[in-house]
């Protein structure tokens, strides 16, 4: 199979939503875990799993702070994450541009 340049970590639809949501923020801005959860529509456990994968790749950063008795987690896209998203979107544009301009697919479809 041809390497299409699509980052498999970002290509997962849920992680793409997370990264795209964070990328829409001005540089340096963060979202609270709860706000991100509401925007993406995930359970806390599911969001934690995806955030952990993105943080392991240095695509996002998270920080826990205390406000009295309440713990607040904030999440931000890192510079590395922004570059990865930019590369992913360019690879997607290239792939779709090739298809739209009459490029050929890596495989042929057989009709039965």
Question: PLM features: what roles do these ranges have?
Answer:
Residues 1-16, 20, 57-59, 103, ...:
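N-terminal leader segment of winged-helix/HTH proteins
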Residues 67-88, 92:
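Basic, amphipathic "hinge/linker" alpha-helix immediately C-terminal to the N-terminal HTH DNA-binding motif
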Residues 2-3, 23, 84-112:
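Amphipathic alpha-helical dimerization/coiled-coil segments
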């Amino acid at each position: 199979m041809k390497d299409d340049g699509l980052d498999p970590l970002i290509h997962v639809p849920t992680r793409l939503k997370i990264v795209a949501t964070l990328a829409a923020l001005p540089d340096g801005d963060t979202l609270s875990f709860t706000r991100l959860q509401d925007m993406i529509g995930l359970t806390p456990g599911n969001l934690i799993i995806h955030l952990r994968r993105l943080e392991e790749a240095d695509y996002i950063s998270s920080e826990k702070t205390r406000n009295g008795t309440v713990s607040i987690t904030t999440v931000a896209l890192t510079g590395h994450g922004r570059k990865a998203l930019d590369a992913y979107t360019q690879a997607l544009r290239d792939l779709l541009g090739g298809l739209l301009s009459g490029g050929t697919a890596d495989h042929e479809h057989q009709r039965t």
